[in-house]
């Protein structure tokens, strides 16, 4: 374990560094028309996890990029988390990753190049786990450490899973526990107990490979990964894009151990309140604990899956084969009123 504390060199952490949804909407507004590409199957309009381009013969190329500042202190683990998070977007689209290139920003006068080497080695290890090469990349001298990947994948066009194609009656499942932002904030504040240090990294370093299997099921109508906008933010994107609303069973949500303890210690990421400020008016009324969990920015979070009854049993069987025990966290229903997410306690 390195003695370097990477989180002390950055103002943000992981996907909590994301620009808030409200501000991002402003940034992405443009008066300049985009190129009308008939081969672009999935682009920017649906706020999806990756772009997909039709390359013929029923196949699509999936393209994505993701990078952020350190969310843990250990350089090797940071590299693993950043790579796992970037590759996840390919799995969330139902695709298979085929190659990655690295994105590195490094304060060369502050942190030794050997530390950056550990970060890249962590990313390389995860690429190996995913069965792809880390084939190159680009680096710059930056005021804070930044690492991530640009990842390319392939997907059969009839197996693409988007975030705006959910249907009324679909059941919602989440493949990883929530609370990553809370525990990593505890670490940044120096409040994380030694016995809890691996709770969040273990989740963040788990590849969402199962998304490729879920994509084979015709009843999986929509899929996305839960990252910086929190469960509420990414579910809201699914609901708005699909023209539905969600009834969320709060007590059924999977949580990392000790989440409530660290909430009581004031370990709430700044991104939580930015998230709530961006979309809180579209949520059911809720108490602080509910808000702090639903809006908690996840880094390398789980897959949020909307599945119809015709494929639900098969989805659970695939999950069980992968060692996952999934329980439903909610249901999609017809949209009524201005609130997209109803939270049942």
UniProtKB/Swiss-Prot annotation:
Active site (record annotation): 15
Entry binding sites for ATP: 18, 46-48, 66, 89, 137-139
Keywords of the record: ATP-binding, Kinase, Magnesium, Metal-binding, Nucleotide-binding, Selenium, Transferase
Ion transport in keyword set: no
Gene Ontology CC, one term: cytoplasm
GO biological process: selenocysteine biosynthetic process
SUPFAM superfamilies named among the record's database cross-references: PurM C-terminal domain-like, PurM N-terminal domain-like
Species this chain originates from: Aeromonas hydrophila subsp. hydrophila (strain ATCC 7966 / DSM 30187 / BCRC 13018 / CCUG 14551 / JCM 1027 / KCTC 2358 / NCIMB 9240 / NCTC 8049)
Catalytic activity: hydrogenselenide + ATP + H2O = selenophosphate + AMP + phosphate + 2 H(+)
TM helices/strands, residue ranges: none
The protein's name: Selenide, water dikinase
Function noted in UniProt: Synthesizes selenophosphate from selenide and ATP.
Subunit structure: Homodimer.
Family: Belongs to the selenophosphate synthase 1 family. Class I subfamily.
The organism's taxonomic lineage, starting at the top: Bacteria, Pseudomonadati, Pseudomonadota, Gammaproteobacteria, Aeromonadales
Cofactor detail note: Binds 1 Mg(2+) ion per monomer.
Residue sites binding Mg(2+) per the record: 49, 89, 225
Cofactor needs: Mg(2+)
Recorded name of the encoding gene: selD
UniProt cross-references to InterPro entries, sorted A to Z: PurM-like_C_dom (IPR010918), PurM-like_C_sf (IPR036676), PurM-like_N (IPR016188), PurM-like_N_sf (IPR036921), SelD_I (IPR023061), SPS/SelD (IPR004536)
EC number of the protein: 2.7.9.3
Record-annotated site: Important for catalytic activity: 18
């Amino acid at each position: 374990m390195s003695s370097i504390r990477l989180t002390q060199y950055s103002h943000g952490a992981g996907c909590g560094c994301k620009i808030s949804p409200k501000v991002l909407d402003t940034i992405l507004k443009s008066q300049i028309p985009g190129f009308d590409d008939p081969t672009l199957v999935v682009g920017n309009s649906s706020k999806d996890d990756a772009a997909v381009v039709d390359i013929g013969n029923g196949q699509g190329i999936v393209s994505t990029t993701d990078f952020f500042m350190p969310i843990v202190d250990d350089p090797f683990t940071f590299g693993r988390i950043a790579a796992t998070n970037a590759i996840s977007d390919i799995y969330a689209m139902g695709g298979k990753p085929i190659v990655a290139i690295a994105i590195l920003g490094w304060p060369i006068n502050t942190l030794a190049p050997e530390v950056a080497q550990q970060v890249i080695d962590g990313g390389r290890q995860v690429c190996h786990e995913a069965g792809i090469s880390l084939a190159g990349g680009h680096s710059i001298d930056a005021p804070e450490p930044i690492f991530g990947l640009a990842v390319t994948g392939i997907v059969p066009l009839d197996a693409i899973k988007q975030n705006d194609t959910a249907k009324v009656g679909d059941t919602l499942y989440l493949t990883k526990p929530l609370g990553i932002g809370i525990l990593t904030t505890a670490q940044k504040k120096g409040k994380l107990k030694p016995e809890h240090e691996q709770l969040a990294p273990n989740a963040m370093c788990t590849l969402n490979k199962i998304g490729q299997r879920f994509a084979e099921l015709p009843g999986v109508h929509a899929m996305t990964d839960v990252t910086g906008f929190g469960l509420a933010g990414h579910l809201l994107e699914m609901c708005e894009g699909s023209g539905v609303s969600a009834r969320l069973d709060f007590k059924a949500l999977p949580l990392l151990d000790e989440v409530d303890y660290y909430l009581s210690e004031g370990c709430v990421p700044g991104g939580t309140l930015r998230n709530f400020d961006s979309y809180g008016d579209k949520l059911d009324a809720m108490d602080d604990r509910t808000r702090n969990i639903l809006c908690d920015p996840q880094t390398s979070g789980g897959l949020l899956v909307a599945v119809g009854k015709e494929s639900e049993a098969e989805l659970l069987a695939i999950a069980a084969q992968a060692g996952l025990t999934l329980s439903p966290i909610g249901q999609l229903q017809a949209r009524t009123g201005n609130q997209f997410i109803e939270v049942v306690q």
